Amino acid sequence: MLVILKETARKLGNVGDVLKVKKGFARNYLIPSGKAVRATRANLAILENSKEKLAAQQAAELETASELAKSFTEIDVLPIYAQAERGVLFGAVSAKQVVAELSKKGIEITTKNVVLGAPIKALGEHEVRIFLHSRVECSLKIHILDASRRGADGTITGTS
């Protein structure tokens, strides 16, 4: 079944792309969630009329994502504090925590942009991938530290 994407999907494509997908995927997920519409003659005509506007919008989004990616190069390691005992976390560090720490540094993204390879359940350094656009991705090192060793001023107390 041919569909036209109404929003960017990480592994599918960008807004305005005409894709051939399985009928069940289109009927059960893409169309009901508003991510795509059927590629009828009328919808293709509407797409054709708005191609220039769409191209300008995508170029602006790509430029914004590239600028945002440059701000990630300024961050060497992002510290995240979590409750731990004997080097093992009580829960996993989530994308929500990564987004919260980045917002403290003035970088605004959503949890949809952050991809954790596996649940982070141990102290130490971990790699996190950030998808800002279908063509722009970057990686970020995060350092998980024990929250009980964090001082009142934010510095680490004691020895490891």
UniProtKB/Swiss-Prot annotation:
Keywords: Ribonucleoprotein, Ribosomal protein, RNA-binding, rRNA-binding. Belongs to the bacterial ribosomal protein bL9 family. GO terms for biological process: translation. GO terms for cellular component: ribonucleoprotein complex; ribosome. It comes from Neorickettsia sennetsu (strain ATCC VR-367 / Miyayama). The gene is rplI. InterPro entries: Ribosomal_bL9, Ribosomal_bL9/RNase_H1_N, Ribosomal_bL9_bac/chp, Ribosomal_bL9_C, Ribosomal_bL9_C_sf, Ribosomal_bL9_N, Ribosomal_bL9_N_sf. This is Large ribosomal subunit protein bL9. Binds to the 23S rRNA. Pfam families: Ribosomal_L9_C, Ribosomal_L9_N. GO terms for molecular function: rRNA binding; structural constituent of ribosome.
